[in-house]
Amino acid sequence: AVIQRSASRREHSPARARRLAMRSPSSDLAPSSGLTDFMLLLMVANMPIQPTKSTFMNLALDEARAAAARNEVPIGAVLVDGEGKILAQAGNRTEAGSDPTAHAEIEVIRQACALRGEARLPDCALYVTLEPCPMCATAISFARLARLYYAAPDAKGGGVEHGPRIFHQPTCHHRPDLYPGIGEDQAAALLRVFFQERR
C-alpha cells in the first residue's frame, strides 16, 4: 500500500495545509529548480545540431589540406542541399587524374549530379576555399546552384569578382547568391605555404 503522509496530514489539519501552501504556493504545480535544469539538459542533448556555414567551410578546408598532401593545389569544396545535407566533398585532383578540369568545384558538382541523377542542383549551396575560376564559375551557373560561399579571393585567376566576372556577363543565365570571406585567412595561408614550399 502507498502511504501518503503529507496528503493525510493536510486533510486532517486544514490550517497546516494553508501554511504549507503559503510557503510554497507552486510546490505542487512546478518541478524543483534542479529537476527543471535536468529536464532542460535532456531537451538540449536530444536536439539535432544544425551545421553552420563555418562547419561546411571547415570541411572544405580539410579537403584542401588533403589535396596539398597529394601534391595538388590546396583547394577544397563541399556541396550541400537545401536542408544542409552534404551531397559531395572533394579537393583538387588535376594531377591525380591527369585532368585539367578536375577542380574541386567540378568534382563536387559531378558527384552531386550523379547522386541525384540530375543535371541541375537549384536548391544547393557550394562551399569552396578559393574564388572559383572562370571554368568553375560557368559550371556553377550551368548547375543552377542557389548559393556560393568562397573563402579567399583570387585576383589572378578568379572568375567571380575578378577576371571575366562570369556571373555579370549577358550570356550568363543564372547567378547564385554570393557570400565571400568565410575562412579567408585559413584558405589564403594554405595556398601561401603550398606555393612557398615549391619555389
Question: Could you describe each region identified by the protein language model?
Answer:
Residues 5-27, 32-33:
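Low-acidity, Ser/Thr- and Arg-rich intrinsically disordered low-complexity segments
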Residues 39, 43-67, 132-199:
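Zinc-dependent deaminase
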Residues 75-80:
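Short beta-strand scaffold segments in enzyme catalytic cores
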Residues 96-106:
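A short, polar/charged loop-to-alpha-helix boundary motif
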Residues 118-130:
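Immediate flanking context of iron-sulfur cluster ligation sites
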